[in-house]
From Swiss-Prot:
Main location: secreted
Signal peptide positions on this chain: 1-23
Lineage: Eukaryota, Metazoa, Ecdysozoa, Arthropoda, Hexapoda
UniProt xrefs under PANTHER family: AT09846P1-RELATED (PTHR39957:SF1)
Tissue specificity as recorded in UniProt: Expressed in fat body.
Role: Probably involved in the antiviral immune response. May have a role in controlling viral load in the adult fat body, after infection with viruses such as the Drosophila C virus.
Name this polypeptide is given: Protein Vago
Subcellular localization, as worded in the UniProt entry: Secreted
Gene Ontology BP annotations: defense response to virus
Entry-linked InterPro entries: SVWC_dom, Vago-like
Assigned keywords, A-Z: Antiviral defense, Secreted, Signal
Amino acid sequence: MESISSMIYLVAMMSLIIGGSQAIPYRPSAYLYNQQYCMDTLTGRQLYIGEVFTREDQCVRIQCLETLQLWEDSCQVPKLTQGNCTPVPSTNPHAEYPRCCPLYECKSYESNSGGTLEQTNIYDHYGTLRSSHLTEMIVIDGRTPPRGEIHTASARKYQV
């Protein structure tokens, strides 16, 4: 009798296990809510995967990658070889990246017998030419007047 009751108990337990596992609906892991984010340690800001922001008072763009790592983009100094180049600060340093990056103004001079040619090129932080300006200073009379002699135009008198 004892073996029959233990057999019934065993069959009942097996049916509960088999029936219970079929009652739990299958749910693929993609449907489970999994909160994953990156943490910017400088600002304490949490970023979800793919989210991007520009750090305040820094011209740096931060992005959260799928690997839960932060990617930082900052302004580069381009390798410019023509002319004397100086950085020109952004007119709006609180703008989003890359608008907050400085531009670079490069001036070059070329002299000839007729005058001087000044070329001003403006580049962005990638080294892409944004604008170019050409100024030519022409020498009309290369001779210097003798001392004491000042050339002036004749005065015109008008009556009202």
